Amino acid sequence: QGFSSSGEEETIRLVNRTMETGIRFENDKPYTVKDVLANTAADKKSIDVLPGDILLKVNGETVDITKDRNSYFSKPSLDRELQLVFNRNGKIVTVNIHPQRTIAPNLYDEWIKNNQATVDAKTNKKVAYHNMKDMGLGELEKFFIDMTQDLYQKDGLILDLRYNTGGNVHD
């Protein structure tokens, strides 16, 4: 008869994780730095990455420009540190970055900042913009602080609840 199983222990999990640096690259030049996203692993005074830098190596491996750039940043586990080598107008620049698991919150914050700038530009700063990420007490307190410091001086208010994850403000 023997032993057989079709349980959870038989499942093989193949998972890759993306090591996010916060460095964004040009769409048409996938190894050329477009910018560095605010408050990410690469957005540190000690990390010297600038728009226009061209990625040459990741952890000592010379990049192949015909290969998908993301393959250099995806592994079964996160590296503790990534060493990136760039060409900056003929000068070699080497940086070490501690990658992060995700940049989703940073992208969300940038989206809010861009919305704020759009509202300011289109209304000549006469309409306030406030985004509440959720309905928790922390976000409610931020709203109250904004109301008392700045928003009350405006002619109108846009309270943006898009992508709000919910919560219990009423408690």
Question: Model-found features: residue ranges?
Answer:
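Catalytic cores of secreted or luminal carbohydrate-active enzymes
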Residues: 1-3
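PDZ/PDZ-like domain segments forming the peptide/carboxylate-binding groove
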Residues: 15-65, 137
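Cleft-lining beta-strand/loop regions that shape enzyme active-site pockets
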Residues: 6-8, 12, 35, 41, ...
